[in-house]
């Protein structure tokens, strides 16, 4: 049983008690807890119910209720002696962004609407983004991980050069990074933390989608600490609301680039993004707010209103548009989910 996030509710002699897991003192013979009166043809049963702290949910084969049997073992009618687990809730921010607002871009996140947003400082102090997808794993771009490293650098070489913050500048230690096996085409890497983070209203993973939310005109939110209008990194988390763009128009905009990022003076920003079947574009021509240097690795967050859940539909890969080019480029999350789940399970 994971101790993180778990609370046990005891029903003893007709009274309820909440006990933190890990508490060595569970005295069932406490004089302050009187035994209930006996009843004819009946008996008193000792029960415990496992519950989870806020921002966690119970994962169990049974209902989480355990009875003390004759062998003095706590058992569930379905799960037996197997204990439930408290797993982190994803995509349920306590203070979601106001989706009625009409000001596009440049808004400050004062409420903690993007608790999955992490800040990564790479080698030589460059700020980039990362996205919390569980209480121990984050997604970012492979290019972020390789910043100021040679193309031959290994994951072991990269790991100690990174500094990572979640929530309100909470420093977390990195155990390892895992690069996508085809990261020159699928610009993605995973970061595993040494310890699980405690999920709170300020620190919460975003869900990975099982269905494709990407369609032209669909609106998503991107947050980050990238450069602002003065080309300086901001110390306040900002966010922008952007629609998914027509992929064909995006390809034409970037001069029909279908190859890995390279210098091209005919491109609006002097370089070509990676554009392929694993990517999509988002952005507006009408407004002058956009993602910029340092925002890569952030999620294109979409709210599923039916489920009232936020999903990372994509991860920002090309963050050099900076309101000069019309579109940012994102890696499709649906193309990543199998690899992500397999990698997390193996590691």
Curated annotation (Swiss-Prot):
InterPro entries assigned: Haptoglobin, Peptidase_S1_PA, Peptidase_S1_PA_chymotrypsin, Peptidase_S1A, Sushi/SCR/CCP_sf, Sushi_SCR_CCP_dom, Trypsin_dom
rRNA-binding listed as a keyword: no
Similarity comment: Belongs to the peptidase S1 family.
SUPFAM superfamilies registered for this protein in UniProt: Complement control module/SCR domain, Trypsin-like serine proteases
Entry keyword annotation includes Phosphoprotein: no
Location relative to the cell: Secreted
Assembly and oligomerization: Tetramer of two alpha and two beta chains; disulfide-linked. The hemoglobin/haptoglobin complex is composed of a haptoglobin dimer bound to two hemoglobin alpha-beta dimers. Interacts with CD163. Interacts with ERGIC3.
Gene: Hp
Domain Peptidase S1: start-end pairs: 103-345
Domain notes for this protein: The beta chain mediates most of the interactions with both subunits of hemoglobin, while the alpha chain forms the homodimeric interface.
Gene3D superfamilies referenced in this protein's UniProt entry, alphabetically: Complement Module, domain 1, Trypsin-like serine proteases
Taxonomic path: Eukaryota, Metazoa, Chordata, Craniata, Vertebrata
Domain Sushi: 31-88
Keywords in alphabetical order: Acute phase, Antibiotic, Antimicrobial, Antioxidant, Disulfide bond, Glycoprotein, Hemoglobin-binding, Immunity, Secreted, Serine protease homolog, Signal, Sushi
Disulphide-bonded residues: 52-86, 90-207, 250-281, 292-322
Annotated glycan sites: 148, 182, 256, 264
GO molecular function, one term: antioxidant activity
Protein name: Haptoglobin
Tissue: Expressed by the liver and secreted in plasma.
One GO CC term on file: extracellular space
Function comment: As a result of hemolysis, hemoglobin is found to accumulate in the kidney and is secreted in the urine. Haptoglobin captures, and combines with free plasma hemoglobin to allow hepatic recycling of heme iron and to prevent kidney damage. Haptoglobin also acts as an antioxidant, has antibacterial activity and plays a role in modulating many aspects of the acute phase response. Hemoglobin/haptoglobin complexes are rapidly cleared by the macrophage CD163 scavenger receptor expressed on the surface of liver Kupfer cells through an endocytic lysosomal degradation pathway.
Region of interest (Interaction with CD163), ranges: 259-264
């Amino acid at each position: 049983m994971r101790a993180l996030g778990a609370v046990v509710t005891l029903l003893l002699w007709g009274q309820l008690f909440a006990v933190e897991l890990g508490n060595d003192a569970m005295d069932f013979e406490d004089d302050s807890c009187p035994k209930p009166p006996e009843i004819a043809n009946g008996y008193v049963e000792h029960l415990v119910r496992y519950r989870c702290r806020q921002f966690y949910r119970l994962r169990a084969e049974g209902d989480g209720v355990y009875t003390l049997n004759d062998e003095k073992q706590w058992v569930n009618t379905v799960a037996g002696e197997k204990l439930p687990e408290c797993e982190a809730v994803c995509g349920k921010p306590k203070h979601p962004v106001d989706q009625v607002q009409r000001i596009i871009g440049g808004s400050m996140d004062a409420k903690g609407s993007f608790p999955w947003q992490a800040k990564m400082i790479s080698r030589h102090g460059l700020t980039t983004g990362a996205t919390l997808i569980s209480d121990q794993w984050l997604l970012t771009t492979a290019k972020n991980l390789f910043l100021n490293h040679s193309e031959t650098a290994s994951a072991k070489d990269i790991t100690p050069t990174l500094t990572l913050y979640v929530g309100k500048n909470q420093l977390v230690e990195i155990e390892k990074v895992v690069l996508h096996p085809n990261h020159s085409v699928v610009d993605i890497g995973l970061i595993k933390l040494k310890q699980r983070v405690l999920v709170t209203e300020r620190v919460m993973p975003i869900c990975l989608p099982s269905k494709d939310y990407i369609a032209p005109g669909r609106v998503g939110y991107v947050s980050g600490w990238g450069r602002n209008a003065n080309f300086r990194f901001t110390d306040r988390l900002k966010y922008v609301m952007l629609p998914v763009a027509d992929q064909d128009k995006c390809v034409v905009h970037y001069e029909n680039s279908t190859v890995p990022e390279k210098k091209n003076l005919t491109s609006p920003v002097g370089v070509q993004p990676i554009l392929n079947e694993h990517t999509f574009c988002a952005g507006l021509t009408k407004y002058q707010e956009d993602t910029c240097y340092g925002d890569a690795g952030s999620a294109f967050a979409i709210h599923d209103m039916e489920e009232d859940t936020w999903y990372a539909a994509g991860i920002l890969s090309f963050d050099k548009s900076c309101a000069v080019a019309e579109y940012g480029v994102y890696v499709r999350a649906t193309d990543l989910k199998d690899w992500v789940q397999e990698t997390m399970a193996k590691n």
